[in-house]
From Swiss-Prot:
This is Nonsense-mediated mRNA decay factor EBS1. One of its GO terms (biological process) is DNA recombination. Disruption phenotype: Results in stabilization of NMD targets. GO terms for cellular component: chromosome, telomeric region; cytoplasm; P-body; telomerase holoenzyme complex. It comes from Saccharomyces cerevisiae (strain ATCC 204508 / S288c). Signal peptide: none annotated. It is found in: Nucleus; Chromosome, Telomere; Cytoplasm, P-body. Residues 596-645, 755-774 are annotated as: Disordered. Its main location: nucleus. Belongs to the EST1 family. Pfam families: EST1, EST1_DNA_bind. Residues 760-772 have a biased composition (Low complexity). One of its GO terms (molecular function) is telomeric DNA binding. The gene is EBS1.
Amino acid sequence: MEPSNTQKEDLPTAFNGIKSQLNSILKSNQLFQDYALLNGFLAFVHSKLNAAILTSIESQCGKSFAADLDSFDQSSISSILDFSWESVHYPIFKWFQMWRNYILFEKENKKQQTKFIDFRKMNSKMLKFFKTVQNFYVNVINTVYKKYDISVLLPKRIIQDLKLSDIENTTNVGDILAVKTFNSSSPLAHLIPTLFHRCLLFLGTAYRYKTLLEEISNKYSISNFKKSLDFFRLASLVLPSAGETYSQAGAIFLQTGNLGIAVFNFVKGMMTKMPSPVSIKNFGALMVDNKSSLNRSLHTTIMNTYLQESKGPRTPAKEILEFYFLGLFGSVWSPTSWRDDTKPNQLNNGIKLRHLENALYETMSARYLNNIKTIFHNLIITIGGFHLLLKRRSDVSAKTLKDLRSNELDYLNFAFKYIAHILNDIVKESWSENPEVSEILGMVRIINCWIKANPMVLQYSQSNLEFVNALAYLINDIVKKKPSPSFSITEHIPKRTYWFEEDLMVKGLSFVNFQLSDFDDYEKILEMDHSLDRLIGNPPLCDKLSASSEMLLRLQAVVNISSQLLQNNNCGVEWSDNKSRYIFNKKIGFKETVKNSMKTSKQSNEKAKLQRKNKPSTTNGSISMADLERQMRSSSLDSFSPTMGYSGSSVPMAPDTFNVKPSGTITGNKVNVELLKIELSGQNADGAITNISPGYSNAAISSSNSTDESSFDLNNILSSMQQKHAEKSFAKSMQGVNEQIPANDVCHQAQRPMQGGLYSSQQPSSMSSLNSAYQNASMPPSASMVSYPYPFLNQQGQGVFPPYNAQNLQWQSEAYSLKSMNFANPTWLGDQYQTSAPSSAYAQAQRQMFQQPMQQDVGKYMQFPFDAQSNTDSMRGNSRNNMF
């Protein structure tokens, strides 16, 4: 049934009426004592919204078999779900947040015992509200599942996880809600994933608020948010192209101090088909805006890790891999925010970049197995960071190396150095011994597919000596160990019956053209039974392969793509059919010989010192000529110190045979001898040195010398899919990332200003004492405003909000955020409070705000202070009341 134009026009009117009613309820004081008013309002609203959703779906059923997908309107259903969260549930959660903060703040301000009674009252009402929200979204899912047979649109794993199979047969045959079946080619099929994704996303966010509100302490761990992360995981499987899911997951990891995986999720949130503006702002607050509390705290955390590393004896491996990497990444991605203006080779906090680099790569090579996921996340950040740099450009037309700027080439140098260490220190050393660790070869698959999908990256990789060497050595090692009797390098693209975990990790990300392309199996999998489950890595048990079998498939894909990437390299690495391995030019020989010769010379010097130390003492400091001659003759002719004819002589003794070495041996300088064997064959030695020891300020190659199109044949390996993900709107957002401020809520659409009653400047009497608590406290600079459906949520600002368990003196020094709050209508963000600057980045008071020790020394090593205002708030805005 198609709704009339009047019905369509009534929807915005109904929305405005609902917002006006909720505005009146929250403005009153009744909610503190009586929950019945809100409960009745929610029952009415949920009934209306449920009916509107079902009506909208029914109105589209007639179009479900239409050939023109553009004629199918799913915006009305999405707008209803968005309205339910943004204009109804979210403001109420924010109201409970302010109530909780008032209770905790009053406790700290008056130095009274914890007000468990008031907190219990608040928590009881909040839990009732949460259950109402949970039931609403679950009922939407259940109703749609009962009314329509959508088994062809959703994986069975998701149906089982949501326990939908329990209600599968509850619909009567003669019921008006008879089951209707449609296939995956129906336009309506595009609506179901969107509807389920919205519901799962909002359920996960509601659980996150529940976790934040029900704890009397602001200390949280990942385990506290398990339910939320489970829903976000399901939402990403249903609709991987939506960046909001990763933004919300990143907010949780930000709240719990897991900065590496938080940035990882923010990068994913920016690289999807539907980028999240919240991810852009949070990424900017962490990595770009050095005036934000998050960026300052990250600098302090890196310093704490450095102090802990210096103290010893235990090396904080996870902290080094996580925080040192972020420091290096920031110093290359946004040098002006991270590097010292006068000393560009060190961070703002004084730590030298070379130390961070050495410690990071040394830890990677020695402690990778226990931290493989962190290294994997860093790889995604590294790859995504390059494309984020391109999106910051005013023009998005860069196609070749000649179009790149110096900072972008420097970033590629950093990225490929990190990749080369992964290939050399992790993959080559451990792939054969750890088949159960899928991340080892999974990283190589992502690296190869990223290079394959991006022509300018391919151009750079083929001239990057360190990367070409590392990839060739890895392929040689795989071929040499021959993981199976039939294993070989072929042009045949392998096939699978289901996707692997790394496929899901980058599914929907633009830098790999939205899926990995080293297997030719997508169409084949779609024709199989349980195809949707296979595409989320959950095949039937009969088709599930062992870890070793999966490793063989990954190896075949890695070898095939790698051999194509190495075909047109400019580093002289060539495949030898006779030797069945890659051989290296003299430049590689020069590099390896110098290293080996220096090592041999050092060992020889140490051996000579040891011989002198162990030399037997002589009687009275003398030795007979006969004994001396005997010792000289018995010494080896291969010694680096040549045998002399007699004591004091500088002439070597005559050799016993004519089997002698070149004259270089006479001087004992083995390095020179080895260098004589080298033929440079016209290679540029300067270029070799540049690639042997690249620095941050240098590109690995000169772009002007590496962009000869005739040297690259991309047709054999480039993906046929063109990159269309650099939308101008997103590029514009990235251009201003330096000016972005932290924000933690997903903005589905711009909210129109609410029509109707506004809050008046009144306050519940129970909170009136708070007005004068900090009347003269300073406020941070104003932030760009985000319009909310209710005025009391439109108060925004940026600054540090200390944890509630901080010391009273420290708390009061930072309590500007709670001064003169009006919790029913807080209008305390005036111009007179927007003039003070943020506190010093490394002030002692700021460091003391950290809650938990990273290690044993409580006084020195402190955990990241994810303040209450923080960039972890959910789903809308950057309010000063966003206490989480």
